[in-house]
Amino acid sequence: MGLEAVLEEIREKGRKEADAIRAESKMDSDRILAEADQKVAGIKAEAEEASTKQAARVTAQEISAANLLVKREILNTQKGLLDEVYEGTIAEIAKLPESFHREAIKKLLTEAKKEIPKGKIHCNARDEAAAKAVLAEKEFSGFILGEPAHIDGGILIEGEGGELQIDYSYRTFMNKVWESGLKDASDILFG
């Protein structure tokens, strides 16, 4: 074997080793690129999932806020309507004839007399004549008419010495009825 053949064999061996190294390097680089592609795909999927979740969360918050705002507006409107009904009822009671107010004062004073047998009653200026007519009756001789009160109707009763007072104004009774029946009224009106 000549020198030329040995050189050719060395060259061939070098080429084979170089080809093997290149093939191994190619496999390594392909593997690294595949792993990188997998990582990129995973990161991309996580980012898409996170952004989808965040978008859903923001959308849900916005919907909740909008629903709350609408509900608040509905409740404010309903409260406004109920307040109008309340004030309208007080106004309609005030328009009732003098005979109604006289009877009401008589019944209220009869009830109050159980707790305050003598004293002073106050009513609004509109009902003074009705109150005087009731006080003229013998059973109410222990009561006198005081200064007019700023009430919608009914009476305020003050015991002798002013220590005991009872509020039998229409608004007080209306408030009791209103508070006890407000939910029922709301359910009927607004379902």
Curated annotation (Swiss-Prot):
Protein name listed in UniProt: A-type ATP synthase subunit E
General function of this protein: Component of the A-type ATP synthase that produces ATP from ADP in the presence of a proton gradient across the membrane.
Keyword Magnesium (UniProt): no
Keywords: ATP synthesis, Cell membrane, Hydrogen ion transport, Ion transport, Membrane, Transport
GO terms assigned for molecular function: ATP binding; proton-transporting ATP synthase activity, rotational mechanism; proton-transporting ATPase activity, rotational mechanism
Subcellular location: Cell membrane
Source organism per UniProt: Methanoregula boonei (strain DSM 21154 / JCM 14090 / 6A8)
Membrane topology note: Peripheral membrane protein
Domain of life: Archaea
Alphabetized SUPFAM superfamilies for the sequence: V-type ATPase subunit E-like
GO BP term, pick one: proton motive force-driven plasma membrane ATP synthesis
Pfam families, alphabetized: vATP-synt_E (PF01991)
HAMAP family associated with the record: ATP_synth_E_arch (MF_00311)
Subunit relationships: Has multiple subunits with at least A(3), B(3), C, D, E, F, H, I and proteolipid K(x).
Main location: membrane
GO cellular component, one term: plasma membrane
Family that this chain belongs to: Belongs to the V-ATPase E subunit family.
